């Protein structure tokens, strides 16, 4: 699930997984399996998810029908937790077992949001969770608290991922990867071909820059110090943030976020 499901994880992070059952299983039989899966992954170096998005959490191991009930409950909520759970599930990719179960559950989610403009807008509004770190004169706005760095994830990667995800969910797309979603949205006319190309290039540049920073720091960081970049790298970073900002505007207009 999450960045792993989208095929966009760089450094290994914590566990993000779930289990879809073809039929109900007695809790006493399921509990041991949940624990075994969790412990096996932990022994391989994948620490627990702080948000408990793991097989061992009963919330994330259910039948298709039970997940369907959850989707409708999450959509009815106006809080961030419900939107986050929908985003997590929508990005999921099957890695074992019957992939048809995941397809069926995702179709249930798509059916649940079809035509639900208010719920889709509530989901999409997270695109504005963080400001774009670009100033009035197109300068990069750094954070002194972070050592004069900019946060690539908050400033560019997340708004692109979530903005594209919201538009993809509205269209009922099955793709999970962000670049693949952009391509399909361009085919459907949501994006102009040129903007789709620019958006894909901006996203890939931000991801590459983050990976370079993680390799240099030997840690899962999203912070980059513009002062340590070349002039060309800073120019490309500004361009990437501006494209992410343009996507925000597309999402705001499409879902009338000024009303929320």
Listing of model-derived features with the role each one plays in the protein:
Residues 26-89, 96, 100-108, 112, ...:
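Conserved catalytic core of two-metal-ion nucleotidyltransferases
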Residues 101-260:
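Conserved nucleotidyltransferase catalytic core and NTase-mimicking acidic/glycine-rich helix/loop elements
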Residues 1-6:
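Short glycine-enriched loops at secondary-structure junctions
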Residues 9-10, 52, 65, 69, ...:
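Flexible, active-site-adjacent loop/turn segments at secondary-structure boundaries
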Residues 16-18, 47, 255:
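Alpha-helical hydrophobic packing sites
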Residues 7-28:
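Catalytic metal-binding acidic patch
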Residues 18-20, 50, 208-210:
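Structured core elements
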Residues 13-17, 37, 44, 132, ...:
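Structural beta-strand/beta-sheet cores of well-ordered domains, especially the beta-sheet scaffolds
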């Amino acid at each position: 699930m999450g960045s792993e499901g989208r095929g966009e994880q760089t450094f290994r992070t914590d566990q993000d997984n779930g289990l879809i059952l073809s039929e109900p299983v007695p809790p006493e039989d399921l509990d041991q399996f949940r624990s075994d899966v969790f412990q096996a992954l932990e022994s391989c170096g994948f620490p627990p998810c702080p948000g408990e998005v793991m097989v061992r959490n009963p919330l994330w191991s259910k039948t298709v029908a039970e997940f369907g009930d959850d989707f409708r409950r999450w959509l009815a909520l106006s809080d961030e937790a419900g939107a986050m759970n929908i985003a997590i599930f929508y990005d999921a990719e099957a890695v074992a077992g019957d992939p048809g179960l995941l397809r069926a559950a995702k179709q249930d989610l798509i059916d649940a949001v079809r035509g639900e403009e208010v719920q889709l807008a509530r989901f999409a509004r997270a695109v504005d969770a963080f400001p774009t770190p670009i100033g009035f004169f197109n300068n990069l706005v750094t954070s002194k608290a972070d050592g004069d760095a900019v946060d690539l994830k908050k400033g560019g990667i997340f708004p692109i991922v979530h903005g594209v995800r919201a538009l993809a969910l509205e269209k009922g797309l099955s793709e999970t990867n962000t670049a693949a979603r952009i391509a399909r949205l361009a085919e459907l006319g949501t994006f102009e071909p040129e903007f789709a190309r620019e958006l894909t290039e901006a996203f890939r540049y931000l991801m590459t820059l983050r990976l370079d920073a993680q390799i240099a720091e030997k840690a899962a960081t999203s912070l980059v110090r513009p002062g340590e970049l070349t002039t060309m790298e800073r120019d490309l970073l500004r361009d990437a943030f501006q494209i992410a900002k343009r996507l925000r505007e597309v999402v705001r207009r499409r879902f009338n976020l000024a009303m929320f």
